[in-house]
Amino acid sequence: MFKRMIQLTTWLVLMVCGWQVQAADEETIKVGVLHSLSGTMAISETTLKDTILMMVDEQNANGGLLGKKLEAVVVDPASDWPLFAEKARELISKEQVDVVFGCWTSVSRKSVLPVFEELDSLLFYPVQYEGEESSKNVFYTGAAPNQQAIPAVDYLMNDIGAERWVLAGTDYVYPRTTNKILEAYLKAKGVADADIMINYTPFGHSDWQSIVAD
């Protein structure tokens, strides 16, 4: 049911936001897929690519959209943040896609944002993010910290009785911004500095033994 709601919302947005104008004279409506198929983020983003292709096939089996078939155009930004921007420009300018579904990390989203705003194209961003950003060219489908992280802290504090906290994450914008918000929230709730541990690791880190031991 949830997948159907997302699918319906997606196609409705395509219809009402004006992207059908570009598609009117084309044989297909092009959907850009900007997810890493190689590198560190491939384990997460490949699944999103597969999901988009499945939804495109399902929609085409149901007659397409606006009387036209959808055509997925897939590129691989390879978990390389500057390459995300290059591939976004390629999809919009060269491939002439009508909309793009892509990114996972906030650093990749921030890398492509100037491209989407410059070329006035639309990005569907699929996961939670740290907030503190809004653009008419991005459809943010995930939760911000006040919708996800803060309620989790409230549950752990009030229902589980957690007293000591570890704010861990990969060393980039989403964990750092979210943890900054959480740290301030915990302190406002009376948690002492000594009971808050903050730790960041690089992408691809796999040795968690020392962190757990601490």
What does each model-found stretch correspond to?
Residues 36, 77, 170:
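Cofactor-binding loop segments of dinucleotide-utilizing enzymes, especially the Rossmann-like FAD-
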Residues 28, 43-50, 63-132, 202-209:
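Beta-alpha junction/loop-to-helix N-cap segments that form part of ligand/metal-binding clefts
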Residues 44-66, 181-188:
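Short, polar/charged alpha-helical segment
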Residues 22-33, 62-69, 157-163:
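Immediate post-signal peptide segment of exported/extracytoplasmic ligand-binding proteins
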Residues 86, 130-131, 137-214:
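Extracellular/periplasmic Venus flytrap/periplasmic-binding protein
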Residues 32-40:
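Acidic/histidine-rich, surface-exposed loop or edge segments in extracytoplasmic proteins
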Residues 1-30:
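Short, low-complexity disordered leader/linker segments with a strong preference
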